[in-house]
Amino acid sequence: MDDVVIVGGGIIGAATAYFLSKEGRKVKVIEKDPTYKTASFPLSLGGFRRQFFQKENILLGKFAREFIFQIPDLLKTEKNPKPTASMVTNGYLLMFGPEHADEQYKALENHKACDAGTKNIKGSELNNFFPYINSEGIETATFTDNQSEGWIDPVSYTHLTLPTMQVV
């Protein structure tokens, strides 16, 4: 008998199944597309970032990054001693016009409180960092260093986590 049944095997369901299985729980995931050919997560961009408005999401983003960096150790098996999710760390640049700048300035306070490593760039200085971007109408922008944010290959990640759960 299963200890836990999870409905939906996307990134949240798969992550939940993984962490519960690491605690010794028997987990079954019910996924309408158990082949993952049309499931949303493998078809997504696989981004991970810290730049959110709420502290909870910032902290979750930090946790996800640490997990992703540990994939080679956490998900290795006899059959796959060097697993990878083809991680690319490239950072994220988010830009805001005057109508959303105040909202972002408030979010930056949360970024600082959570040690997210976010840098604020005035719109007038954006071209000093990114000369190929048209900064017209940009009030402010935020960026993290290249090691904090990026993306993984969702298909590779899905295949790495499938052995930790029974998908039906």
Report each predicted region and the residues it spans.
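Short beta-strand to alpha-helix junction loop
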Residues: 97-101, 144-157
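Conserved small/polar residues in nucleotide/adenosyl-binding loops
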Residues: 158-164
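Dinucleotide-binding Rossmann-like beta1-alpha1 core, especially the glycine-rich loop
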Residues: 45-129
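Short, flexible, mixed-charge acidic loops at enzyme active sites
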Residues: 39-45, 133
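Glycine-rich FAD pyrophosphate-binding loop
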Residues: 22-40
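N-terminal Rossmann-like FAD-binding beta1-loop-alpha1 element of flavoenzymes
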Residues: 3-28
